[in-house]
């Protein structure tokens, strides 16, 4: 939140955060105290004589009125004064309409006369209520209210039974005694409300008195409330301090400040006052009138009228939408906007202005595609970039760059808009300011224009999921639209038909950092919603990729070269062509293999892959090239299409993301697009009308098919007319007919479509788009070529509209295909007018559906989000909401994040017992097999050792148990589960990395496998803790993964299938552990919002209405959005309630028995089995009028068992339908019994035999005997009889249940088609088998009764009515049911949502023990704070409630904090940072008085480029400041060669006075220091010297492009020809620096500490940069003491985590490897030789470990061919000792782990006074060097800088000759020969090249040309980029696999002799000349 203060917008003092918000009602005296208008506002006018009037409605004390004016209260101006409240004293109190209902509730709870609670507060019930409702005052009131409702008398003394006020006279004594309740004992009135008035009415108090009803005036209520005691207030749920009952009645009305009701000034007319002001004027007027009338003693009814009016005005000011009241209007007739309307609704204050605001620094324009951008870039128009600014703080490092921007001003781009001084003054650069204003100082802020590389947030509405707002890097481009990469359109759901998108430029570095680390596009590639990528390759690239990877694509050399030009990660090697003769040709697959990153392994299929191939004999051949195999990063076979490159789980992109990390995947996307699109330019892809034409035979076919279809339809119609059509079960005749017709027509369409497709050639362009998956489907093709097909509206054929026909052009009752919407033309042929009309009808329906659906799903999504917004993973790993209620104990029940899991198969679940044993049991009896798989010694061990055999048996037992467990968990045998760590792929990776030969026996001991897996599963911890509960929870969370682990890594499969070596197995275990730990959900993750988005987003894709799917046995279930709505609303009456009834035993298999149960369930009334009924007058039963009944009726009457005389002459004859009777298994007897049971003796019912021709029931009324007596009324009676009989008839037909359950109207019986409803059993062999059993499905539900039926399976039977399940089975059952129903809704249309999101929603809805609907009735009844509730719905009601009860909001949720502008406790806001004050002492001061800080000052040079990848390390981070001279600033820590983390900045010459005149800079300056291409901690991979990079490191550095083609920036001091201390080629030559003579041991080019491969090695310094003794202290791990090299601190920089040698988050070989740390990224020093966790000799990461694979991006010197212990590299060869006999890398003083190098070694202690790197102790190559050697003290004569042999000025050893002078013109770095005046020293002459034998500064033994160490030797040439740690694909061990030849002349930017100015001389040239 920003306060006032200086105009910078930030207030000077930091604002405290708001901890909680207390609600309450203001008391009248408080209102008066806070009011600024003493005496109240008395006048309705606003002004008087043109001045605002004191005491009027525009009182100047209330705030500023004119723009220029000041406030009379606080003297602030318009922006500063917040406004002040006034007040109006009301003449009579009035009700507050918001509290009216509360007022009534309280009134009903207290005595009308004595204001005591009607229930004694000692009543146990009250005590119970108080205990139960702690902290829920609202509940308390409700309960107390329920208790008091029944009481209609105020309880007197202790005699509770004292009903009538007999003891009233002694009431006074009662009060003094205080024994009982002490009430007055009088009758209580009922309180009623009418409009805004309350009435009290008494019902006859005593027998004689009448009811009396009086109007309750607000005064009276006020009096009653005033007498309520504080304790009783509390019982009533009020908080006496904040909200007493009498304050709910308005006596003093607050007048809002002027800023809340500003007047609008219209030109030329008076001010237009705000609605509120108008309202207040009305109130003041009527109030004054009322006061006058009262004082003048007016008539009562006048005053009553006035009070009523005042009441009305006060009410409508608060709420102008009161029911039953007229609206308060303005003169124009527009209703006024009341306070309530200001708050509520989407546009209201809360949702419109607090929860969501309009923001600055945003831009919006149309988007257009640009495939050449990277996926995380966004092209921004220059016009926008020049308008949006970013405030950058001036530091010594960026002052020159900013000064330059300021100089350019706002008119030129890039420039700046404002300078903000440190005192807050803002200088606007748009209006030419004084030049003196433009001077910058550190601490100022410059608002500079947006420039390349800035981080922005890009967003497209509707923002349905988190992938709709992602971070991009800016790329400024001409023209006026945002450009973005095509692959990013999928997550944004964007297309380029005119979509607009928004861009937000974050304004602080913190925000930037968060976006960069959390929200950048590459990090969002995989969505947690369904654990798959959301970005794939689309459109033309996808079409092209399919064409490109076909078998017959060959490229010539020229084309290959051309394509490689577009491959940014190319390592400079062209692969061997696939075809050599007659001319070299490369295949598309080969080129694609270059694009695939790393060592990816992947198997997919092409979209046209035939299903039967996988099992057939050709499964390895794949005749159609449809099986895609990528092995070790090479595309071996297969055509790529959407399946491998699209957004599916397990696609190439997905694997790349999981294995290689997001950054490499980003390059993968870009490279595919640039390379493939450029190939497509050569190849071409077009589509024309020709593609839509098939051959004539096909058209003939199509015609015939359609003709036949029409014929079939006519036949069906005729059948229906002739009544020959049998209705299918459960359908009417009409439905059956429609279904059949539909089927015929659809078959016709499909058939024609497929024949049309078959006719298309392989080269058809429609087809190629469909096959690749880029656009369209088979149906689209067939519609274009063959037939458009049937048009539907609401799932049926086009309905009749005009008098039994669809259009007037058809005859009536035409059911034929044409008339009902079958379009038989194709799009190519064109539609006839009627067809076109029907087609338009179908299309229009789709549009309407979409529009309606959008609104529905939008609201659903909002409710979901609001209900779960504050649910997050806390630091104890539980999932809780804002009020700390546990929702889940572990997120997703396994504690893992959704992005990092994949589908895997559980191997043990499916196979039969035999297969299981064969695959998993280690068979130690079969010796031959063992010998094949294990090495000899292991075989002996296994065969001879019983202990081992027992272990192996135990392992198998364990797996068998696992299998049993799995079969319980997955009873259906579905083995696909979502787990972290794809084990099979990891094993495959291991096989590739360790070059496992599957034909050789393995050296992996089976026991090692068993033990290893056991150990590993102990390490995979989700739940910490040792108590039984934690242990159980841990087991539950990791059970599936452990089972998967044990079954995949079992000894048998390890030996037989995988054949891993011991080494590989160790690697695998380490990898699994680190991958598993990376997959754990992060605390602070807002999983609630994530789940809501993940469910809401698929909902928008769902269909809205459910169509009746034709042919499904007519049983309809609601699906799609309506069903989702029912579920989350927990609707009591779902549209289609239904039970799925499973049966037991015999009845499940026997249709007859199933039918019995069906009859027992289905509700049958008499009507359902009745054919017809009739009423006859049949006075003589013996000879009935119905002749056909005569026979059997006589039988009855011959021997009547009833009184024939009582029988009524009226007869009800019911004829039953035999078919229905038998269908429902009913007999006549049963029916008659039911009737007799229902009506008893009042009816006589006789029936004929079940086998009779017609089934007849005859029913007569039995008259009672006395009716006979009253003869004279007989006629009436007889009339009665037949009417009565009518009633009985209708009652019997509808209401009488013959059998079944009332609620179940219909039951369907069928055999399940899908597996999930079949009964799955496990056979004896242990296989799964699905049996078809009869299942019943019902319309209507009655779970309780159905479950108790005989033969119903009570376990599997389910209901889809959630509420019913809750009532019958309880909360756990309903949770599972809800989850299943939700899953069913979502998966119905083929979407997949990860289980954790569904689970979270279900848990949110059920975790309170009752069902919480996701509506205002559920969400807003939780105990969350009022602010959260009011941001959802019912805004005003919630706030009123909160005020009345004095609630407080603890500010723990998300909404609350957003409303108050605070950081929400989510994500990075849910923890605090701890600052180590001790470490801050090591911080570095930056002297600001740096000489030469001009435009060409050193820092200007550095930051002249785009912000470097790191953005510059802030000086305070690094502790290198001992002994800094004023020039020290020049060596700012972040200035060094291209941003190496600890770059040359801390160079000795910084501390030495030698560099006194330093603008001159060190060669360590990479000419493009900040360029993205320079090696920096955040861009580990880019600086591969290869690729399209010029020797000067990176042509992509924006700053250098325009200014200096060769990479020299002319004004950069480093290249200033006269700069004395700089000579780009001088090895380390600074004539004045005594310590740096070229022979200084720390300099020899071969000195280990000077590894040319260290990233900071700048291309122009041929051998050594004077500023960095160990060549960039962070050079990832080479430089013997690297990590410990900091003069002041053992670990790099205590404050910068990324430099600490032990930093856990870095590893050079990253993705695939991490010895001890969960996540690595390559250039970290933690790989340094001294880092304890990784010593090159550490056994399991031995230098030969292939894991340092050729492409491992950052190859550090621990790589095999350079690891000191690596046998193949043999640095131990005597002639390698780099310049000193006792300094062989294996010598104790060097070995990286050697104690003498440890930073803590005594002579190296950081506290040693001036332990600068150039102090002699640090010269590793000096012969007598031994760090602990006492003789080596810095003052030792041997090393005195003035010692003749060392001093650069001494004639003996001036590198060139004594006459060399720093200013000598010949010493210009740009002079072509560049010789510092002496031939022997010209770096371009062979004699002095580091490879020349004569140059061996201190040690004759080490000639750089010595064979083992020739720098040009391909294995290790210090100059060869191939060996540079940053080169992405280089492995010294495999020169053959590597693709970069070290001798390639043009490419070795790091070569010492490679002087930029003489490109012709390359390291090997000079070598040859020697």
UniProtKB/Swiss-Prot annotation:
Q: Which residues are Mg(2+) 2-binding? A: 495, 497
Q: Where does RNA bind?
A: 67, 460, 499
Here the segments flagged for biased composition (Low complexity) are 1546-1568, 1608-1959
Q: Which GO terms describe its molecular function?
A: core promoter sequence-specific DNA binding; DNA binding; DNA-directed RNA polymerase activity; hydrolase activity; metal ion binding; promoter-specific chromatin binding
Q: Which UniProt keywords apply?
A: Acetylation, Chromosome, Cytoplasm, DNA-binding, DNA-directed RNA polymerase, Hydrolase, Isopeptide bond, Magnesium, Metal-binding, Methylation, Nucleotidyltransferase, Nucleus, Phosphoprotein, Repeat, Transcription, Transferase, Ubl conjugation, Zinc
Per the record, what is the consequence of mutating residue 1922 to S? Loss of methylation and dimethylation but no effect on phosphorylation. Highly decreases methylation and dimethylation
According to the UniProt entry, which residues carry N6,N6-dimethyllysine? 1838, 1859, 1866, 1873, 1887, 1908, 1922, 1936
Q: Which residues carry this modification: Asymmetric dimethylarginine?
A: 1810
List of residues that carry N6,N6,N6-trimethyllysine:
1866, 1873
Q: What is the effect of changing residue 1866 to S?
A: Loss of methylation and dimethylation but no effect on phosphorylation. Highly decreases methylation and dimethylation. Decreases methylation but no effect on dimethylation
| Entry GO CC | euchromatin; mitochondrion; nucleoplasm; nucleus; RNA polymerase II, core complex
Residues with the modification Phosphoserine, per the entry, are 27, 217, 1843, 1845, 1847, 1849-1850, 1857, 1861, 1864, 1868, 1875, 1878, 1882, 1896, 1899, 1906, 1913, 1917, 1920, 1927, 1931, 1934
Q: PTM per UniProt?
A: The tandem heptapeptide repeats in the C-terminal domain (CTD) can be highly phosphorylated. The phosphorylation activates Pol II. Phosphorylation occurs mainly at residues 'Ser-2' and 'Ser-5' of the heptapeptide repeat and is mediated, at least, by CDK7 and CDK9. POLR2A associated with DNA is specifically phosphorylated at 'Ser-5' of the CTD by CDK7, promoting transcription initiation by triggering dissociation from DNA. Phosphorylated at 'Ser-2', Ser-5' and 'Ser-7' of the CTD by CDK9 (P-TEFb complex), promoting transcription elongation. Among tandem heptapeptide repeats of the C-terminal domain (CTD) some do not match the Y-S-P-T-S-P-S consensus, the seventh serine residue 'Ser-7' being replaced by a lysine. 'Lys-7' in these non-consensus heptapeptide repeats can be alternatively acetylated, methylated and dimethylated. EP300 is one of the enzyme able to acetylate 'Lys-7'. Acetylation at 'Lys-7' of non-consensus heptapeptide repeats is associated with 'Ser-2' phosphorylation and active transcription. It may regulate initiation or early elongation steps of transcription specially for inducible genes.
At what positions is Symmetric dimethylarginine found? 1810
Q: Which residues bind DNA template strand?
A: 346, 358, 1416
Q: Which residues carry this modification: N6-methyllysine?
A: 1838, 1859, 1866, 1873, 1887, 1922, 1936
Residues covered by region (C-terminal domain (CTD)): 1593-1960
| Note on domains (UniProt) | The C-terminal domain (CTD) serves as a platform for assembly of factors that regulate transcription initiation, elongation, termination and mRNA processing.
**Record protein name field:** DNA-directed RNA polymerase II subunit RPB1
User: From which organism does this entry originate?
Assistant: Mus musculus (Mouse)
